[in-house]
Each structure stands twice: as structure tokens, then as C-alpha cells.
């Protein structure tokens, strides 16, 4: 009986200690989403330009060139709906201005894409409906003039060092081989389109025009066969790599996509330390913006970002209290976003590792790094000019000294003959 009582006493004691621990020790904090940054491309649009022999000129498009279409509006409304579902429980179901901030480039198509996206993300309900027949509410989208945009409009410029890198890229074997392989093809396209300045760097415009026309049911010219379109598409992707890679990718990143990455890093750090930003920060921009950022992160898949594609950064606070970053890319509307892993880090990347690994592609002083360093030839010119300038200065000093002494000398005496003044 004593042993039995002793057993019950030990069991009771363990339960008591467990109860005390539950009361004294705080419960473990569950992993939680703290902050989201989105960068998306605008939706379907009309061509940004056409070519001289194109039978479909600007009047063929209801709003002209470079404008968001109804298809593009729907694409972004659907993306907004998908984001609403993904972040249910994180964002309020109704719009609260303290929770979200949206910035766009100053183009009609990106501004309108952001507005369509917000219509899907935050449909009005209850008191937010200003008209019972309209399931929409105005939500602010911020922008700056194109000439002042140093965050979302790429490639950034003017930047002499970047232009120098591009000239050096043109001399690489990869660029030279690509140019040689496609010389006759580019001549054919130039002849069919009427363009006189077609290069590896500009041929994407032809593909873009034909792609937009084909997407909207317009008949392509006979020369634009499926094989030609496929080849144009490949050259279009090459032009993106030319802008931000192929040669000195890390330095190009510091001058281009690293500028945006620097702001994203700053925001992630700020939210991990002070929580002073909105829960959701949205950037509405272009395919070049996405490629510039993904090349800086070294996660670019080599293909043009499709309409309404979206790069996602999610900041989590782990149950340990530390923070981690997860990235996703939504480039297909009927599939879940693809997980992206920063090279050298798992998909759930600790924030400190994310910051450390991306540090090399973030500029310290963009204006300074954009300057072209003086080469040996430039140094010789500078020295020669300095020597010439010094010699000229000495000659001027010598000349002034002589003139000064001549003026300081007293006037000489002149003998006058007797009677000279008496004629």
C-alpha cells in the first residue's frame, strides 16, 4: 500500500510541476507572416510601337500604343483575387490604408494594372460601398515622373560605367557569336519590316509587335512563320540577358537591379526591427524591372516575365523569434507560385543570410559607381595637359614681369640742339 501511495504521489508531483511550467513559461510563439513585398508586371497591352511595313498601325488599337487592354485588366483583377486568397488572415478583408502601400511607374498601363489588381484584392464591403451597384472603391496608387524614377524604371541612367560595360559586352565571344549566327536572319527581318537599324538589341520590338497582334487575333504576314516567331522570341530573351548579364553580371546588378534590391533589403530590415511599414508593399512595373531584380538575385530563369507575373518576398518571424525570407514567382495564373531559392541559402532563408548574400550586388554610392574610372590613356592625357598648362602659366608670368619692369623704368633724357625750338 505504501508503494502504491508513493507512486500516486510521484504522479501527482509531476502533474503539479508540469502545471507550474505551463503557468510560468510563456507559450512558444507560432511562426507568423510579418511583411510582404510584391513586384508585378503590368497586364496585357497593345504594342509599344510598330514597324514601317506593318498593315496594323496605331489606329488599329482602341487606346493607341502601349496601353492596357481589357484582357490585361482582367489578368490583374484575377491576380488581386489570388493574392486576397493567399493572404487571407494576414490582410484585413477590407481595405485599410495603414496596411498597404502601392507604387507604380508613371505609365498608363502600370497605373491601371495596379488599380485593377487592387479592385480584386480589396473589393468594397459594408460601409466602403459608395454605390450599391459598383463593386469597386478608389485606392491610392503612388508614382513619380518617369524622368525622376530611380527605383522601378530600368535600365537606369544616365550611368557612364554601365554604358561602358555594355560596350564591353558587345565584344564578348557570346555576343559576337550570336550576332554572326543571326546576321542573315536580321537582314531578312529588316527587309520585311522596313526597319533600317535592326540589331540584336532592338529586334525584340519586332517580336513584341507581332506577339501583340497575334494575341489579339490579327493575321500575321506570311514571313512571320511559327519558326520565325520562335527565333524572334529567343532573340528577345537574349536582349534581356544583354541588358543585365552575359558579362560582369554582378557589377551590372550594382548599377541596375541592385538599386531596387537595396530598397527591398532596407524594408525587410525595418520590418524585422521596428514594424513601421505597412504589411503589404506593392510595386507595379515592367518585365525589365522583374528581370533586373531577378538577375541581381541570380534567380532569373532566362525567359521574359509574362503579363501580370509577380515576384513575392515574404518575411516570417520564426517561433525562435528570428526572421526568415521566402521568395516566390507567380508566372502562371493556373498554378501556385514557384518557390525561389537564393543561391547559397535554403528556400526559408534566414534574414541575416539573405542580407549577407545579397550585399555584393547592392551599390554603396550609385552616382559614384556610375563614373568611369580613368585608364592609362586618360592619365597620360591629363599629365600632358597639366604640363602644357604649367608651361603656359610660366610664360604668362614671365611676360607680365617684363611688361611691369618696362613700365616701371623712368623716362630717358633727350638732348635738344640749340635753336631747335626757334625756327
Swiss-Prot record:
Its EC number is 3.1.3.2. It is an enzyme of class 3 (hydrolase). The active site is at 42 (nucleophile), 287 (proton donor). Gene3D superfamilies: Phosphoglycerate mutase-like. The keyword Secreted does not apply. Residues 402-423 are cytoplasmic. GO terms for cellular component: lysosomal lumen; lysosomal membrane. Pfam families: His_Phos_2 (PF00328). This is Lysosomal acid phosphatase. It comes from Pongo abelii (Sumatran orangutan).
